[in-house]
Amino acid sequence: MGRTREAGCVAAGMVIGAGACYCVYRLTWGKDENEKLWDDEDEEEEEEEESCSGKPEIGGKTVKERKTHVGVGAGAKPQDDSKSKAEANVGPENGPDVKKEVYPESHSEGGLEAKAKALFKSLKEQASAKAGRGIRFPNISRIRTLTSSLPCPGGRGGGCHPGRTGSRARNRTSGKVKRKNRSKSNKAPATAWPVRRGKFSFPYKIDDILSAPDLQKVLNILERTNDPFTQEVALVTLGNNAAYSFNQNAIRELGGVPIIAKLIKTRDPIIREKTYNALNNLSVNSENQGKIKTYISQVCDDTMVCRLDSAVQMAGLRLLTNMTVTNHYQHLLSYSFPDFFALLFLGNHFTKIQTMKLIINFTENPAMTRELVSCKVPSELISLFNKEWDREILLNILTLFENINDNIKSEGLASSRKEFSRSSLFFLFKESGVCVKKIKALASHKDLVVKVKVLKVLTKL
């Protein structure tokens, strides 16, 4: 109930705030329109007075016919062009036959309008005198003073009002632009993940289980196209079909392994990731491993140099782990042992676990022990035996230590300790004694499975 009540309060606050903003907007918009109306009328009056005073009369008529306004200070009301104005000849004021235009309103109405305008002007003058500088009031002297920190309201993007010529038309157009901008801003934001769009219509769905002829079509498309979108869809389709044993054989027999593996060289990380995933599913088959072994060194190099903890690196580590389950191709990766241990220390949680699984595959082969324990490793690797790590990491590092310790005994490497440097894995695990102290400290771990594993390792020392 507490969360429901909080949500209701938040919704009510948003509604009240929106209503207040709308009221302020309506009030300020009407104020601006009212000011523009009076400003336009004042400008027309001043322009007419200047033109009449500056130009002589010719033949009893002024060059520009003067408009007279009924009442003192009264402005002419705006009318449509379709309405004709009444013209009347008034007695000789400035000269004979001076033609003046008057509106067909009554004198009483004009007098009221003049009084209202005079009152409005006096109120504006009083307000400006009280307010002082820096605050915007209706246009009195045609110069609008603004504070340096406040934008001029009513303009576009916080700017000042547009010019007077065609001001109403531009206000209408600017209103339309603002409404369009608001409608565009209401659209849902773009997704965080990049979505590729290709012009090519792929003939199959990525989760379709295809027959051999259909797989051949997909391989042909993958071999001929250079479009990243088409390559990605084809690789995902082949990878999903490679999860089934009957399609693993079909893809190999159709010559699909070299077609897929050629995309390892591409620079697109998404394409490389999908390539590794497809080869990873194919590598479950031992016959396919014989085809993939040609590219295993290239996969290893790319996995080590690509961005740390990236999806490409994880896909490459999974492929290398599958390829080293058996002992047939482990020797092809022995040169990368220092890189694996560096990655074990630098990587995040998931990278550490996947790297441990890969190294454990090597530790289960006694023939790889000498090369494994002689490689240089960072001394910070000992921190993986701390209690702060979760169960999975602790169980993997304990298994790694257990296998290496067993292999050192079985291979008789304990007597040849002089062959190994102080920065080697042999010295860190066997000679320093720090590792054994860390393992003994784990005997008091709160996890029962970790405790059992620690006791098993300690009994073999």
Swiss-Prot record:
The chain crosses the membrane at residues 7-29. It is a single-pass membrane protein. Residues 96-110 have a biased composition (Basic and acidic residues). GO terms for biological process: hematopoietic stem cell homeostasis. One of its GO terms (cellular component) is mitochondrion. ARM repeats lie at residues 203-243, 245-284, 366-406, 423-461. Residues 1-6, 26-36 are annotated as: Mitochondrion outer membrane (MOM)-targeting sequence. The keyword Membrane applies. Residues 1-6 are mitochondrial intermembrane. Residues 34-110, 148-192 are annotated as: Disordered. Its main location: mitochondrion. Keywords: Membrane, Mitochondrion, Mitochondrion outer membrane, Repeat, Signal-anchor, Transmembrane, Transmembrane helix. The keyword Protein transport does not apply. Residues 38-51 have a biased composition (Acidic residues). Residues 30-461 are cytoplasmic. It is found in: Mitochondrion; Mitochondrion outer membrane. Pfam families: Arm_2 (PF04826). Signal peptide: none annotated. Residues 167-185 have a biased composition (Basic residues). Belongs to the eutherian X-chromosome-specific Armcx family. Interacts with MIRO1. Regulates mitochondrial transport during axon regeneration. Increases the proportion of motile mitochondria by recruiting stationary mitochondria into the motile pool. Enhances mitochondria movement and neurite growth in both adult axons and embryonic neurons. Promotes neuronal survival and axon regeneration after nerve injury. May link mitochondria to the Trak1-kinesin motor complex via its interaction with MIRO1. This is Armadillo repeat-containing X-linked protein 1. It comes from Rattus norvegicus (Rat). The gene is Armcx1.
